[in-house]
Curated annotation (Swiss-Prot):
Gene Ontology biological-process annotations: isopentenyl diphosphate biosynthetic process, methylerythritol 4-phosphate pathway; terpenoid biosynthetic process
Note describing how the cofactor binds: Binds 1 [4Fe-4S] cluster.
Record SUPFAM superfamilies: Nitrite and sulphite reductase 4Fe-4S domain-like
Reactions accelerated catalytically: (2E)-4-hydroxy-3-methylbut-2-enyl diphosphate + oxidized [flavodoxin] + H2O + 2 H(+) = 2-C-methyl-D-erythritol 2,4-cyclic diphosphate + reduced [flavodoxin]
The protein's annotated pathway: Isoprenoid biosynthesis; isopentenyl diphosphate biosynthesis via DXP pathway; isopentenyl diphosphate from 1-deoxy-D-xylulose 5-phosphate: step 5/6
Residues reported in the UniProt entry to bind [4Fe-4S] cluster: C307, C310, C353, E360
Keywords: 4Fe-4S, Iron, Iron-sulfur, Isoprene biosynthesis, Metal-binding, Oxidoreductase
Named cofactor requirement(s): [4Fe-4S] cluster
Name of the featured protein: 4-hydroxy-3-methylbut-2-en-1-yl diphosphate synthase (flavodoxin)
Physiological role: Converts 2C-methyl-D-erythritol 2,4-cyclodiphosphate (ME-2,4cPP) into 1-hydroxy-2-methyl-2-(E)-butenyl 4-diphosphate.
Top-level class of the enzyme under EC nomenclature: oxidoreductase
Gene: ispG
One MF term in the entry's GO annotations: 4-hydroxy-3-methylbut-2-enyl-diphosphate synthase activity (flavodoxin)
Entry EC no(s): 1.17.7.3
Length: 420
């Protein structure tokens, strides 16, 4: 596995050298930053709900969105979805997720084949027995015809059973057999690489192929992608499948992908969270962004630093203010990205007592240190390391929000550019 040192912001890290792939104009791999993507959970045949969810995911920051294409009605809806999104100003690339009958759907619906930016193929269910290679080739030939990239996406839950059985039998015949887990990992990697080689033999360029090998256990994911990275230079899509709900899914995905990303492995990521009933699908986009930003690989939104609280901070004022500021930033980012270039790098601190509050606030671009229990009820505000104001009274939160807005305008706004 070859690597080069790439520096995004102030955090250099060894980045595995992969072949860049253009997905609807978004570059995955090569020297491009790690791309955030997501997937809808709507019925794709329902154009209205799918358009609404894709638009929400795109507004949240998803740079590629995958949609299910599982039947004729779904395939027929894809060009309508693409057209509607473009009218709404959402030019996000759409990826078609195909299983079992993708070859037939692409052949029967050429407008769908044209509207999609990428096709996802699962080697484990693209076809069975003597039909497998033919149906895989049909999709690859469609990709060549329409000049589209493909993701060869292996999933341990639908792994090619013939390949797995062959490797299990071969392993059993050897004197010092590997564990069943090791054979499973090898089968996943081989399935991806064999399929990629076949696609290239058919005529699809390596700059049109992305690989993924998804499992549900953290150590398996680390092992499988390390093997893939060592044995190919294809662009890699990272994702922990069936990660779960809530904090479990967030922690598992972040643990696995954080280790791989730190090693320079991974060109695009998706955080696969099981949404709670009525939950917000865009949560997975936010988590992916925060993972990359926390590790210093990309910047998406200003991050608010806030202390966790202790016995000195019995008041909830600083917690409420930190939440308000973070929510306000998230809500305004679609506008701010256009109006204030570079605002993603802003750092804000909302601290709760005198112990670390002033110091942390000085380290941020703009910070506030609220009083802890028994401390003087005055609130110093620091801008670029210097104390600029002391707030008092019931309007502290509103006053600080205005100061943050003014700081953004003065530092990142048009007036600053004209003055310079």
């Amino acid at each position: 596995m070859s690597s080069e040192t790439v520096s995004y912001f102030s955090h250099p890290f060894p980045r595995r050298q992969s072949v860049g792939v253009s997905v609807g104009g978004v570059i995955v791999g090569g020297s491009a930053p790690v791309v955030v993507q997501s997937m809808t959970n709507t019925d794709t045949a329902d154009v209205d709900s799918t358009v609404a969810q894709v638009a929400a995911l795109h507004r949240a920051g998803s740079e590629i969105v995958r949609i299910t294409v599982d039947r004729d009605e779904s395939a027929a809806a894809v060009p309508k979805i693409r057209e509607r999104l473009e009218r709404l100003g959402h030019d996000v690339p759409l990826v078609g997720d195909f299983h079992y009958i993708g070859h037939k759907l692409l052949a029967d619906h050429p407008a769908c084949a044209e509207a999609l930016a990428k096709y996802r193929i699962n080697p484990g269910n693209v076809g069975f027995k003597d039909k497998k290679d033919k149906q895989f080739a049909d999709i690859v030939e469609m990709a060549i015809r329409y000049d589209k990239p493909v993701r060869i996406g292996v999933n341990w839950g639908s792994l090619d059973q013939e390949l797995l059985t062959t490797l299990m039998d071969r392993n059993q015949a050897e004197g010092a057999p590997l564990s069943a887990q090791d054979v499973m990992r090898e089968a996943i990697v081989q399935s991806a690489l064999i399929s990629a080689n076949l696609a290239e033999e058919i005529g699809l360029g390596r700059d049109k192929i992305i690989l993924s090998a998804k499992v549900s256990q953290v150590q398996d994911l680390i092992a499988v992608y390390t093997m893939l990275a060592q044995r190919s230079n294809h662009a890699l899509h990272l994702g922990l499948t069936e990660a779960g709900m809530g904090t479990k899914g967030i922690v598992a995905s972040s643990a696995a992908m954080g280790i791989l990303l730190q090693q320079g492995i991974g060109d695009t990521i998706r955080i696969s969270l099981t949404p709670e009933p009525g939950g917000d699908r865009t949560r997975e986009v936010q988590v992916a962004q925060e993972l990359l930003q926390t590790m210093g690989f990309r910047q998406f939104v200003p991050i608010v630093a806030a202390c966790p609280g202790c016995g000195r901070t019995t008041s909830t004022v600083f917690q409420e203010l930190a939440q308000t500021i973070q929510e306000d930033i998230r809500r305004n980012m679609p506008l701010w990205r256009e109006k204030y270039p570079g605002v993603e790098a802003l750092s804000v601190a909302v601290m709760g007592c005198i112990v670390n509050g002033p110091g942390e606030s000085k380290h941020a671009d703009i910070g506030i240190s609220l009083p802890g229990t028994g401390e003087t009820p005055s609130v110093p505000v620091f801008v670029d390391g210097k104390k600029v104001a002391t707030l008092r009274g019931p309007g502290i939160a509103e006053d600080f929000q205005k100061m943050v807005a003014d700081y953004i305008e003065n530092r990142f706004g048009l007036g600053r550019k004209i003055a310079s």
